[in-house]
């Protein structure tokens, strides 16, 4: 809601209290350097969630690549053709494993999908959806049936994850995790209070949930639409939940209470937390404290849309509502931390003009 007494001054920055965790640690979201900050002043900058949006593998805060060439996947609808574009089509293709790029080879034709679809299906079924004869692509389409000038039934040909368990091994960082970690190292980890104590000592190692469980699809392949559990809870059911069911999705520094994959105790909000604070899917609300006037990321994967080969992550729009965006979009980044239950409030009343200040015991 429109909370006015959740301002905290910590480590030279302003934060907003999101909630009190079960162990009395306090979850905070970055809110700039002044209580008057708004828009892009409330984030540490912008970032893509990841540089690839064509594969659900990369919706992980971390992920793992166990990839293989797949050229006989389930037929699916593809709705991302442009009806007036002249695409090239061929009767064969090659794949470069080093660059992970497909290329058209052999005999080729070109034309709009509407004008050449019969000849394509019969003799030249492969396309990169490129207007260049030598264009390359990260996935290929085998055209199977004409649906409309901008859509077709296709087989995806991909170099992609072999199964769902593989992507949960969490060996590689997302783009946004790299940005958050770099910021934290400079501005919290390597920064000290007036007593020479690192500000990281004030923090508690709590779970950041990158919930990759799903309610439909398979969570890893390009040929199936996947709806992740966070989407089902918050969009279809409107029943947010703070439980993180899958150990691999519980991002923590220590493996005592999570996956032990974080370098630093910092992450992002989930859309469940946004919903509990007052955010609603596609319903404008610029009156609650998480609405800043700048769109910014959560760490909740929501949908992989096989009809467009787009992976979507949850975010808060400039107007304050919960929405989704492709993972390659550049949105604001607002780090989230947890103050230790051992800290003491040393001043302030949490209001805009008098934010809380905190200290460690005997410090």
Language-model segment annotations:
Residues 1-363:
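Long, domain-scale functional regions
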